[in-house]
């Protein structure tokens, strides 16, 4: 599940043409965010929310993309 969250996060970030640095915005290290996107490490919920906010993505939007991704795998 962690790997899937990171993968979806990366898809959203790239679709917005944002760099890791822009999304991290000092709330989290770029390296840590990169590891999260690759499914290597997790991040705190606070960091996750901050990064979503930096991309102007609501939690509901992320959940929508996540559920569509999961449903398409079935």
Where are these regions (language model features)?
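Residues that mark the N-terminal boundary/hinge immediately upstream of a DNA-recognition element
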Residues: 8, 19, 44-47
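Short, conserved catalytic or interaction motifs in soluble domains
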Residues: 38
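Short alpha-helical DNA-recognition segment
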Residues: 16-35
């Amino acid at each position: 599940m962690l790997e899937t969250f990171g993968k979806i996060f990366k898809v959203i970030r790239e679709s917005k043409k944002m760099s890791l640095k822009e999304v991290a915005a000092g709330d989290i290290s770029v390296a840590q965010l990169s590891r999260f996107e690759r499914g290597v490490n997790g991040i705190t919920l606070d960091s996750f929310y901050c990064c979503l906010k930096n991309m102007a993505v609501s939690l509901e939007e992320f959940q929508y993309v996540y559920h569509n991704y999961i449903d398409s795998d079935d």
